[in-house]
């Protein structure tokens, strides 16, 4: 498993590479394509399936082969900022186009937390790419629950330059949680994200909610930052 300092060393060694994007460095190694940066390079394997709270220091690498196989690691938090634990998401998969407009992708992600006792979890995902947009499904086995997710990333069609992504997840708890008036054994949550770059800044407007409310929110442990409806505006700018 790659350590964060090893990722940073690799990143430093590639600073002289041609810039493929403001936050991604890319280099060809024979039949392989290597990418490093502070922006996820695969939306299905990083960020879209199971987004995590991103810390001030984050980044990763992605190695893909002409055959369609790929492997990578993404760390949404390097554990440097106060209150942020080190997280390393390791993934592998296969991606292949049927033609110029349609393709498919399958893969597996492992979420691990080396510096804490939180058990690792796995996620199996698959989806279709149609005219640049992605539609998929994912199944994961967190230590306390099972999750089934439907997602869509409509980046292939951006009205007014705005990217749109949606996610809907059903969570089945391994052990029902006691709340006022009964128990919660399962719940659902969802989110809608609008994204647009503006003067070098990546802007995200996110609406999230769940089917829980009131005292039942004590049982919530889903993807969103809170149980009730929430609107979040996020702005991010690369340092290089």
What would you call each of these model-derived segments?
Residues 37-41, 74-78, 95, 109-113, ...:
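Outer-membrane beta-barrel pore domains and translocons
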Residues 131, 192-200, 225-240:
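Outer-membrane beta-barrel "beta-signal"
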